Amino acid sequence: HLGVPKAVAIARAIAEVDPYFEVELFTEGFTDENAETFMDGLDFVCDACDQVRAKANLRWYAKVNGIPLIMETSDRGMIDIERYDEANTPFLHGRISDDMMEEMRISSAWKPEYFDAFIDVSQASQRGVSSLQAIGTTLVGWPQLYTDVAAGGSHAAQVIRSVFLGEHVPDARHYLEVNEQLLESVN
């Protein structure tokens, strides 16, 4: 999928699962201009955005529209469940203040404090921290292994299903790190 826009790659994958699904592409990404159209009719938002502005605006509009949001980060299997369908839910479990949210919504670049709000650098793996430090020099973006991405997608789907079934799924951050659990079971 190198060189193929993320929206196109995902649309192709959806068509392979069920060619009768109706898919609407937003090739320009998620923007203020298309936010209301994008959110219209959604039951859940899955954040797979790379740009800080898009990540912030997804949360802003999810909260305005009362739509739960999920973000899976392949580092340590981190998964954020953000219950904007529940009253008074703060942005990213209170990790993003209203002032920081306003900054992020118009920002064109990542700042260290934005990275920390989204991934909590103190909890990131050593490999993840090294990758963050290399972005913009030897790396163009956050590296992700397919196995981690596939596992994360599965975890996100399980959470979404549980929410849709009416099970109690609180606003929270979880780490579902398989490698850590495997090492702990051996030791």
Where are these regions (language model features)?
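Glycine-rich phosphate-binding loop and adjoining beta1-alpha1-beta2 segment
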Residues: H1-D18
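Residue-level recognition of alpha-helix initiation/capping sites
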Residues: P5, F30, V52-R53, H155
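Short glycine/serine/threonine/alanine-rich loop segments
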Residues: P19-V23, G66-I67
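Conserved SAM/SAH-binding loop
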Residues: F26-A35
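A short, aliphatic-rich alpha-helical micro-motif
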Residues: F38-D43
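E1/E1-like adenylate-forming module used to activate ubiquitin-like modifiers
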Residues: F44-T147, N179-N187
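Mid-domain beta-loop-alpha active-site segment that forms a flexible
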Residues: G141-F164
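Phosphate-binding loop/pocket of nucleotide- and phosphate-handling active sites
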Residues: V159-N187
